[in-house]
């Protein structure tokens, strides 16, 4: 079983409009509300793929109850309740444009943060792999993910970590390392304080920087150009076919689902990388975020090429 962790989930609300009128009333006919957050996208894709998944994180108030109720019934759930209210994230779809209003989210009390660590520690007993995704809510220390990674390491559970900014920096500077990280070029540039290109020789040098020491897998998305990866001392380039992109949002989360599934099933390097890329591509072909059509899985799978470089 895979444990997904979403520390700052949201209710994602979609308002489709023909036109967004400013400083007046806009009436919406069809409103969509879903359980949102990067970790819950991972959860949905794992469930659709057929893997057993347990979802956890922080929820609060009436919106927190709504969120838990609107997660697929096939998914096991064990969220931790806090005093603060789970946030809304609003997307106004007008014409070919999308305007977003994102709430900051609740402020987590120090004791709640400590109590969740105990909650997380207990959940580790019943899972084989951990996937941690997304931002930290206000109130938690910047090195909180390092604390989760430490507990998972102590329990012998591999961790796939998908975060960015100061939270990722804190983990990289910690002695407690995740099994997998999946930065993109922009995030690598931010971490190193210099521009990082997609040149394979440069990426090889970058991923051997001391900052990344001790991390077994580093998987770098190159968008339409595929993926560059480092596993131990071995480097790989994944070439992907061109596809018709409908909605790329959530493709990174779907990739995390594939990585986590590959670890769960102890797949070869090539199998893990292909699965991760295929799930990311399948998400991009769907209108709904964090959703894959498994009927197209094998067709794409057979087109991917993994090369050791």
UniProtKB/Swiss-Prot annotation:
UniProt-listed InterPro entries: Carboh/pur_kinase_PfkB_CS, LacC, PfkB_dom, Ribokinase-like, Tagatose/fructose_Pkinase
Name of the protein in question: Tagatose-6-phosphate kinase
PANTHER family: 1-PHOSPHOFRUCTOKINASE, 1-PHOSPHOFRUCTOKINASE-RELATED
Enzyme class: transferase
Keywords from the UniProt entry: ATP-binding, Kinase, Lactose metabolism, Nucleotide-binding, Transferase
Gene3D superfamilies linked: 3.40.1190.20
Keyword Transferase: yes
Keyword Kinase recorded: yes
Recorded family membership: Belongs to the carbohydrate kinase PfkB family. LacC subfamily.
Reactions that this protein is recorded to catalyse: D-tagatofuranose 6-phosphate + ATP = D-tagatofuranose 1,6-bisphosphate + ADP + H(+)
Pfam families with a match to the protein in the record: PfkB
Record EC number: 2.7.1.144
Native source species: Streptococcus pneumoniae (strain Taiwan19F-14)
GO cellular component terms, semicolon-separated: cytosol
GO term, biological process aspect, one: D-tagatose 6-phosphate catabolic process
Metabolic or biological pathway, per its Swiss-Prot or TrEMBL entry: Carbohydrate metabolism; D-tagatose 6-phosphate degradation; D-glyceraldehyde 3-phosphate and glycerone phosphate from D-tagatose 6-phosphate: step 1/2
